[in-house]
Amino acid sequence: MRSVHVRLILASVFVVALCALAATQGRQPPDPGKALTTTMTTVNQQILDMAEDFPADKYNFKATPEVRSFAEVMVHVMSGTAYAAKAGRGENVQWSELDPKAYSGKPAIVAALKKAIADNDSTLKATPATRFAASPEPWLAVIEHTAEHYGQLVVYYRLNGIVPPASRPKK
């Protein structure tokens, strides 16, 4: 009687295992490169939306005198995006802070930010999946750092009585 129960249990486990195996057939394994690219694209688009939306006459706004202005934060974020593209291509690069004074106002910053994002997007698309599986750097660090500054920029928006683009009702 006991051996019948053991066989029944083993048969049940076997059937469950077979069902689980069948359920996973045809599914693609997770793609870290795709996840990273999607996240980087999202955070870059949020930053670009802010750069395009924030009033030009407020680009020099600072929450307090000792912090970066809106324009300086945008150039700082652009520095990270440019760094990610270069490091992602395997270039021997150090974080080289771009000089905010090199960009004269909103149009120049928005144009340079678009260029940095496009360069980074091209690098991400050209990067083989095996590279992402081995290490998500430099993109993961830049995504995290950019997200911190996104939060800072939300505060700049709110201090100016403006609702950030991502917080506005969808049309």
Model regions: which residues?
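N-terminal secretory signal peptides that target proteins for export/translocation
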Residues: 1-6
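Bacterial N-terminal signal peptides
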Residues: 9-20
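Bacterial Sec-dependent signal peptides at the C-terminal "C-region" and cleavage site
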Residues: 20-29
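Carbohydrate-interacting regions of secretory-pathway proteins
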Residues: 26, 41-45, 101-102, 109-111
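N-terminal beta-strand motif that seeds the catalytic metal site of vicinal oxygen chelate
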Residues: 28-40
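Short, contiguous alpha-helical
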Residues: 37-48, 58-97, 130-171
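Acidic/histidine-rich alpha-helical segments that form the ligand environment
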Residues: 101-146
